[in-house]
Amino acid sequence: MAELTIDPASIRKALDDFVSSYKPSDTPTQEVGYVATAGDGIAHVTGLPGCMANELLTFEDGTLGLAFNLDAREIGVVILGDFAGIEEGQEVRRTGEVLSVPVGDGYLGRVVDPLGKPIDGLGEIQNIEGRRILEAQAPDVMHRHPVDEPLSTGLKAIDAMTPIGRGQRQLIIGDRQTGKTAIAIDTIINQKANWESGDPKKQVRCIYVAIGQKGSTIASVKQSLEDAGAMEYTTIVASPAADSAGFKYIAPYTGSAIGQHWMYNGKHVLIVFDDLSKQAEAYRSISLLLRRPPGREAYPGDVFYLHSRLLERCAKVSDDLGGGSMTGLPIVETKANDVSAYIPTNVISITDGQIFLQSDLFNANQRPAVDVGISVSRVGGAAQTKALKKVSGTLKISLAQYRSLESFAMFASDLDAASKAQLTRGAHLTELLKQPQFHPYSPEQEVVSVWTGTHGKLDDLDLKDVLPFEQGLLDYIDHNTDILKTIRETEEFTADTEAALDKAVDEFRSTFVSGSGKPLEEKKVESVKAAPVDQEKIVAGEK
């Protein structure tokens, strides 16, 4: 039998050959964590030491979660969806991805959830053009363009006094049931003419984000848009009241991501957040369940950042990036008309103006119930056509003076002629600004209407005859003159146009029959200027 010998050199050579030819196994490795506790839309997960902030996690039943808190021993996860099937001890796995949604023109006319999945029963969404992360950065200052292009709402009270421009953030604020959603829906419907023009520079794609509303309310909004033919260019992102707090929290970011895709492709977008009060409440509940320190009104300390990083994405980008825009209409609900509460003041400071809807005005049948004194647009005349800017210059100050004089006149027994004329003018202007829902005006119709009111052509009418007179006048001018066409094509209000309008109004007045069945009498419009006051002259040396 041969003697067995050990050759160190052979052993070394064999090991070197093995190491040089070794290839790691192709079997993938994956971190696995476990649910420690779960409930109320929140799960605490142990393990997953490599998890990143805002990373997507998957539970055993396929439900997604968002890594919110990264503590030393566990992760606080916001469950995106139904949490009934998530129990203690179940496995949780990392995805290595952050939250994103599909984007593209396939979303037009569809109703989707905050994850971008269709919920309208019309099948899968086609024509997807990629994905965009929800926490996308807003355009920086050098990539923005000043807001200088009007976005018409079709509402006389807003377009004339608090105009909105493409790329602006205009807050709609007021108590519940004061017509906030109605203004937003009317604005969406008013974009129909631009969409049907086929001009990409005029077309506006609309996104309506419903946060924490009743399912029946969202269905009603969808039906209203369909009846008006506006769903063709509108996307609804729905997170109804029955959804988890996580869905209500991310819904506005989903709508914003869909809109940013169009904005960076040179298109114009209008996005409505209805409403951000519900999103803030959902974020507060998430933060409290995750034991984050509460602050004012129990909101977490970063609730301002919650809304600022969302609304800063609304912008008009420079021509180098395509010249697109995304206009934001955030809605915030107040309690007892208190605009000094935490969330209202936060959003007011972020946005470029606010439209304040007063419940007292709404109950007095002044709709839209815009409070002229506190409503403002920080873009101003830059977001108006030259024609509307010219005729509406005195409208806001006239109404503000009327409000103050009206309260004074309640206690005064005798007023001078100028004050009476100012009260008459203000009452007729207030009546003129009333407008039914789903009845938008074109910009040229608004010019004619506002000019008629500010130049005293309505002052001798009974208040109940103001709106019938206005409608009859617009029909008369449309069928018998080229005034509306001229204003529409030139976007200017020249002296010749004004003279032609003045003549047309006088001609129509001679044919108008009031509600009492009597024709109008020719009356000289009283001036609203103050009458001169006779003062005793004091001559030097007189005794």
Swiss-Prot record:
Q: What class of enzyme is it?
A: translocase
Q: Where is this site: Required for activity?
A: 375
Reactions catalysed, as given in the entry: ATP + H2O + 4 H(+)(in) = ADP + phosphate + 5 H(+)(out)
- Pfam families in UniProt: ATP-synt_ab (PF00006), ATP-synt_ab_C (PF00306), ATP-synt_ab_N (PF02874)
Is Zinc found in the keyword set? Answer: no
Q: List the disulfide bonds.
A: none
Predominant localisation class: membrane
Annotated GO CC locations: plasma membrane; proton-transporting ATP synthase complex
Report the locations given in the UniProt record.
Cell membrane
Q: Which InterPro entries match?
A: ATP_synth_asu-like_sf, ATP_synth_asu_C, ATP_synth_asu_C_sf, ATP_synth_F1_a_nt-bd_dom, ATP_synth_F1_asu, ATPase_a/bsu_AS, ATPase_F1/V1/A1_a/bsu_N, ATPase_F1/V1/A1_a/bsu_N_sf
Question: Which UniProt keywords are listed?
Answer: ATP synthesis, ATP-binding, Cell membrane, CF(1), Hydrogen ion transport, Ion transport, Membrane, Nucleotide-binding, Translocase, Transport
| Gene3D superfamilies from the UniProt entry | 2.40.30.20, ATP synthase alpha/beta chain, C-terminal domain (1.20.150.20), P-loop containing nucleotide triphosphate hydrolases (3.40.50.300)
Assigned EC number: 7.1.2.2
List, alphabetically, the CDD domains matched: ATP-synt_F1_alpha_C, ATP-synt_F1_alpha_N, F1-ATPase_alpha_CD
The entry's function note states: Produces ATP from ADP in the presence of a proton gradient across the membrane. The alpha chain is a regulatory subunit.
Assembly and binders: F-type ATPases have 2 components, CF(1) - the catalytic core - and CF(0) - the membrane proton channel. CF(1) has five subunits: alpha(3), beta(3), gamma(1), delta(1), epsilon(1). CF(0) has three main subunits: a(1), b(2) and c(9-12). The alpha and beta chains form an alternating ring which encloses part of the gamma chain. CF(1) is attached to CF(0) by a central stalk formed by the gamma and epsilon chains, while a peripheral stalk is formed by the delta and b chains.
Report the HAMAP family cross-referenced here: ATP_synth_alpha_bact
Q: Give the similarity note.
A: Belongs to the ATPase alpha/beta chains family.
| Name the record gives this protein | ATP synthase subunit alpha
Q: What is the lineage of its organism?
A: Bacteria, Bacillati, Actinomycetota, Actinomycetes, Bifidobacteriales
